[in-house]
Swiss-Prot record:
Signal peptide: none annotated. It comes from Prochlorococcus marinus (strain MIT 9313). This is Alanine--tRNA ligase. Belongs to the class-II aminoacyl-tRNA synthetase family. Consists of three domains; the N-terminal catalytic domain, the editing domain and the C-terminal C-Ala domain. The editing domain removes incorrectly charged amino acids, while the C-Ala domain, along with tRNA(Ala), serves as a bridge to cooperatively bring together the editing and aminoacylation centers thus stimulating deacylation of misacylated tRNAs. Its main location: cytoplasm. Gene3D superfamilies: 2.40.30.130, 3.10.310.40, 3.30.54.20, 6.10.250.550, Bira Bifunctional Protein, Domain 2 (3.30.930.10), Threonyl-trna Synthetase, Chain A, domain 2 (3.30.980.10). It is an enzyme of class 6 (ligase). InterPro entries: aa-tRNA-synth_II/BPL/LPL, Ala-tRNA-lgiase_IIc, Ala-tRNA-ligase_IIc_anticod-bd, Ala-tRNA-synth_IIc_core, Ala-tRNA-synth_IIc_N, Ala-tRNA_ligase, Ala_tRNA_ligase_euk/bac, DHHA1_dom. Its EC number is 6.1.1.7. GO terms for biological process: alanyl-tRNA aminoacylation. It catalyses: tRNA(Ala) + L-alanine + ATP = L-alanyl-tRNA(Ala) + AMP + diphosphate.
């Protein structure tokens, strides 16, 4: 292998990729440049999907929109470009991921210094022979040519003048711009200087580009000199590594080749013995694995839009080329591990995000392998017939039915020397849009009515959610604001019917899936719909959501993608519900039957027929039994059979439920077998953990158990743990002491409350002594009606009795008050009548009850002493006044 021979040849020049990177940054750091870490591949610039150049992080500085980080800067910037993706692996130097070494001047040094340093770095640090170097300048940049020729000393015959298309940089139609100068390496200097053609990439490779930003271009194309001139340079790390390591292409440098070796090892092949076709596949794998590893590290996840689509496309190309070289099993985790190990020294964040990177690689690979296997089988049948080309209809069927990307069909066709009828593909897509419009209904009803009528007029939705969680679909119907519509725009809440869907529609107690619909949309700029519920109406699935971006119209093709995390939680909860019913039958009563259920993303609820409460001990047994089944890792068996076969096998059905002739049976062997149309885990171990939260009664003879499973258990326990931590902090005890401490506090509180009640009673008696003077004479009787707040019922009774004792047997005492003056929601009224009043037929119990009604309450008691309560403190004064009037009339 060429790399191993070239990395060390006895001299001190940088050779490895790491050495080249370090040498470049050190060279400019020693010349007062601030070393700037690589920015993310996800740029801050909203007009650009990915970081495509080393200067992109500094673009706001060059455009005058941000302050410069320093007068001089240098960086090694990771970049991604996919405009030439079809050339990756087929040419010596095309890549998707690459590192751009750069030095920058923000209004500091300019052209001559930049050229001199570039030459010094190239010839003295990297040790390249000037005889192997050629430079280019813009055709009108006499200054640059003069510097190269007279200051640096480059042979004039090896200075090439180039047109604007090659050697003039501009940020856009207007704004900062300027000429460029490039340094090329000549692999064949013996051919001489008379016939130099820089387009000959077999002889020349451009490795260092110097941009001199010295002009501003106005709307009419006029160039005026900039007051502050800037320098932007870029050296391709991979290209310099190829030159210094003496290998035939960038892929066989130490920067990429270890990944090729890893992939070749997984395939059981010797890369150096392969033909060009085989080598191309391994080059694609090596290049793309660097790209997707860094994309995931920088927060990009696979999707069908924007940078997420770029990552998905790259990842799928890796899997596809892996299969071409015989790697049939999932291998992206191994490639991800190798990529991290290769690049972690320069990018430590790869290690920090290792788990995230590997998890995303595994998920997306598994998802695509399903699609790939189905599509390749169909495509193989097409190719057996030796067609002249793959028809548009065939390509569309692969795309529409099997989710096979068009570009992948094109790539496979090209490998067989065929083309794809793209015009026919577009026609097939348009025909589907027309069919969708013809199938759409036109109604003007309320939302529910609209959905019901729509469901009645449409064919049943093809549900694919047992097999796939993502697939292309066509929009058949739209409802906006309760009316059918042909299109919906950003901000609209919509109900959408698709011809087929991976989304589970709410039924059998399980909630509908969440997720996203995405596609090109009618505006061509992309549409995104968040789906937050799915319901079923006559086997038509209605997706409830909101248009987040773009415009959606009838006939549009969208990619339906279920939120996998939500689906996994629902699956765990649904299978846990089956285990719960089995445990209840085993622990409590074998005759227990289901009365209802709820399977949500973060909780589950199971209602069952039972005449008594489930004891705490039984709940512990149920919980232990279920967690035991989870840890035993039972594989679930899901199959369809006739209802008679299912019942004969012992499958549990819900009483009163109507079932079709053919039913779906979910079997946890030896544990549970139920008729069920919901989604479930493949193995009980996927549930993780099960925890009962509550047991209660919902109706006569019906009990309810609420529980959590999977990740929700951790959230529940964390919440409980947080409560305990706060208690420990407040009580200043250890966990083992908390029960004893709380019991002690309860006793202290009980004692304090008893003492407080006694104190209030004494206070009431003390206060009441002064009230005796307020009694008024009504004939031969004494009447006292007064308000006394801040006293509980017992204290108020003591006060009334004490006043009656002072006033004698011919007295009537009525007291009212608020036990808590700040709470007008609780009123207490007390009446104490002497023997003479009772002899006249007056009774304290009846009297105080009638008065309490004025405060929104009631009560009563003995003829001589009674207490009542009320809920309206604002009416208390009026009630006491009424008591005074009523007694005056009764006693007068």
């Amino acid at each position: 292998m060429a790399v191993a021979r070239s990395l060390r040849s006895g001299d001190s020049r940088p050779r490895t990729g790491s050495e080249i990177r370090t040498a470049f940054l050190t060279f400019f750091a020693e010349r007062a440049h601030q070393v700037i870490p690589s920015a993310s591949l996800v740029p801050e610039d909203p007009t650009v999907l990915l970081t495509i150049a080393g200067m992109l992080p500094f673009k706001p500085v060059f455009m005058g929109q941000a302050e410069r980080p320093a007068p001089r800067a240098t960086s090694s910037q990771k970049c991604i470009r996919t405009n030439d993706i079809e050339n990756v692996g087929r040419t010596a130097r095309h890549h998707t991921f690459f590192e751009m070494l750069g030095n920058f001047s923000f209004g500091d040094y300019f052209k001559q210094q930049a050229i001199e340093w570039a030459w010094e770095l190239t010839t003295e640090v990297f040790g390249l022979d000037p005889k192997n170097l050629v430079v280019s300048v813009f055709r009108e940049d006499d200054e640059a040519e003069t510097i190269w020729r007279d200051v640096v000393g480059v042979n004039p015959k090896r200075i090439m003048r180039m047109d604007e298309a090659d050697n003039f940089w501009a940020s856009g139609p207007t704004g900062p711009c300027g000429p460029c100068s490039e340094i090329y390496y000549d692999f064949k200097p013996d051919l001489g200087n008379d016939d130099i053609d820089l387009e000959d990439d077999g002889r020349f490779v451009e490795f260092y580009n110097l941009v001199f930003m010295q002009y501003n271009r106005d709307g009419e194309g006029n160039l005026t000199p900039l007051a502050n001139r800037n320098i932007d340079t870029g050296m391709g790390l991979e290209r310099m590594a190829q030159i210094l390591q003496g290998v035939p292409n960038n892929y066989e440098t130490d920067i990429i080749y270890p990944l090729i070796e890893t992939a070749a090892g997984l395939a059981g092949l010797d890369y150096q013995k392969l033909d060009e076709k085989g080598k191309t596949s391994f080059k694609v794998i090596g290049d793309h694995c660097r790209a997707i590893t860094h994309l995931i590290c920088d927060g990009v996840t696979a999707s069908n839009l924007g940078r997420g689509y770029i990552m998905r496309r790259l990842l799928r190309r890796v899997v596809r080329h892996g299969r071409l070289v015989g790697i049939e099993k999932p291998f992206l985790q191994a490639m991800g591990e190798a990529a991290i190990a290769l690049m972690v020294e320069a990018y430590p964040q790869l290690e920090e995000r290792r788990k995230l990177i590997l998890a995303e690689l595994n998920r997306e690979e598994a998802r695509f392998l399903e699609t790939l296997e189905r599509g390749e089988k169909v495509l193989a049948d097409v190719l057996v017939a030796n067609p002249q080309m793959i028809s548009g209809g065939q390509a569309f069927e692969l795309y529409d039915t099997y989710g096979f990307p068009l570009e992948l069909t094109q790539e496979i066709a090209e490998e067989h020397g065929l083309t794809v009828d793209l015009q026919g593909f577009e026609q097939a897509m348009d025909q589907q849009r027309q069919r969708a419009k013809a199938a759409a209904v036109s109604i003007d009803l309320t939302l529910q009515g609209a959905i019901e009528q729509m469901a009645a007029e449409l064919e049943a939705t093809r549900f694919q959610g047992y097999e796939v969680l993502e697939q292309p679909c066509c929009v058949l119907a739209l409802v906006v604001n309760g009316e059918s519509a042909e299109r919906a725009s950003a901000g609209d809440s919509v109900q959408i019917v698709l011809d087929t869907t991976p989304f589970y529609g709410e039924s059998g107690g399980q909630v509908g899936d969440h997720g996203v619909l995405s596609g090109e949309g009618s505006g061509g700029n992309g549409v995104i719909v968040t789906v937050d519920d799915v319901s079923r109406h006559r086997n038509v699935f209605v997706h409830f959501g909101r248009i987040e971006r773009g415009t959606l119209a009838l006939g549009d093709l969208v990619n339906a993608q279920v939120d996998r995390a939500c689906r996994r939680r629902a699956q765990a909860n649904h299978t846990a519900t089956h285990l719960l019913q089995a445990a209840l039958k085993q622990v409590v009563d074998s005759g227990i039957g289901q009365a209802g259920s709820l399977v949500d993303f973060d909780r589950l609820r199971f209602d069952f027929h039972c005449a008594r409460a489930v004891t705490a001990k039984e709940l512990e047994q149920i919980e232990a039994l279920i967690n035991g089944w989870i840890m035993e890792s039972h594989d679930l068996i899901v199959e369809e059979m006739s209802i008679q076969e299912a019942k004969a096998a012992g499958a549990v059905a819900m009483f009163g439920e109507k079932y079709a002739d053919v039913v779906r049976v979910v079997d946890v062997p030896g544990v549970s077998m139920e008729l069920c149309g919901g989604t479930h885990v493949a193995n009980t171990a996927e549930i993780g953990l099960f925890k009962i939260v509550a047991e209660s009664s919902v109706a006569a003879g019906i009990r309810r158990i609420e529980a959590v499973a999977g990740p929700a258990v951790l959230a529940y326990l964390n919440e409980r743990d947080e409560v305990v931590k706060k208690l420990l902090e407040r009580l200043k005890v250890q966990p083992s002491e908390i029960v004893e401490r709380v019991t002690s506090l309860q006793e202290e509180l009980k004692s304090s409350q008893k003492a407080l009640t006694a104190a209030r009673a004494e206070l009431a008696v003390a206060k009441s002594a002064a009230l005796a003077t307020q009694a008024v004479a009504v004939g031969e009787y004494q009447l006292l009606v007064a308000r006394l707040d801040g006293v509980e019922g017992a204290g108020l009774q003591n006060a009334a009795q004490g006043l009656l004792d002072q006033l004698g047997d011919g007295a009537a005492v009525v007291l009212g008050g608020l036990p808590d003056p700040s709470d007008e929601g609780k009123v207490i009224l007390v009446a104490a009548f002497g023997k003479q009043l009772i002899a006249q037929g007056q009774q304290a119990g009846k009297f105080i009850g009638s008065i309490a009604k004025r405060c929104g309450g009631g009560g009563g008691g003995r003829p001589n002493l009674a207490q009542a309560g009320g809920r309206d403190g604002a009416a208390l004064d009026g009630a006491l006044e009424a008591a005074k009037v009523d007694l005056q009339q009764a006693l007068g």
